[in-house]
Amino acid sequence: MKYTSYILAFQLCIVLGSLGCYCQDPYVKEAENLKKYFNAGHSDVADNGTLFLGILKNWKEESDRKIMQSQIVSFYFKLFKNFKDDQSIQKSVETIKEDMNVKFFNSNKKKRDDFEKLTNYSVTDLNVQRKAIHELIQVMAELSPAAKTGKRKRSQMLFRGRRASQ
């Protein structure tokens, strides 16, 4: 009886192990489809190094990586937009975009819509240029870490002051 249970356990391991190949994220199959479409599996693609992977390896801190990832995701959205009418890869593109939505935007539609709005602004549009310059000082203030930490210190000091006076 002991050997029978070992054999059944072994067979179960084999079945579960073989299922692992089929349980990949949906984007893997679709990315392979895009590789075939773009002939991206050829050795000449590796010439002159990588586009994104080397950059991502340079940044270890999560906030820095998010900045780089946002630019990379923006690139892919623009790339996919160029091929939106190509029916042979439409399913692959949509699957990958949806998976990016889940992974990068945490399935937050508002965040994704705002991100796409930002990436779709044309820097050659005069109206966009004027609005961007008009908002520049406020945007720069938002970027400054000193402005954010200064507010936090003030509110902490007020809180501590109240505690001391009580």
Curated annotation (Swiss-Prot):
Residues bearing carbohydrate: N48, N120
Keyword line: Antiviral defense, Cleavage on pair of basic residues, Cytokine, Glycoprotein, Growth regulation, Pharmaceutical, Pyrrolidone carboxylic acid, Secreted, Signal
Key word Glycoprotein present: yes
Entry's induction text: By cytokines, most notably interleukin IL-12, secreted by professional antigen-presenting cells such as monocytes/macrophages and dendritic cells.
Region: Disordered, residue numbers: 147-166
Main function: Type II interferon produced by immune cells such as T-cells and NK cells that plays crucial roles in antimicrobial, antiviral, and antitumor responses by activating effector immune cells and enhancing antigen presentation. Primarily signals through the JAK-STAT pathway after interaction with its receptor IFNGR1 to affect gene regulation. Upon IFNG binding, IFNGR1 intracellular domain opens out to allow association of downstream signaling components JAK2, JAK1 and STAT1, leading to STAT1 activation, nuclear translocation and transcription of IFNG-regulated genes.
Quaternary structure annotation from Swiss-Prot or TrEMBL: Homodimer. Interacts with IFNGR1 (via extracellular domain); this interaction promotes IFNGR1 dimerization.
Name under which the protein is recorded: Interferon gamma
Organism: Homo sapiens
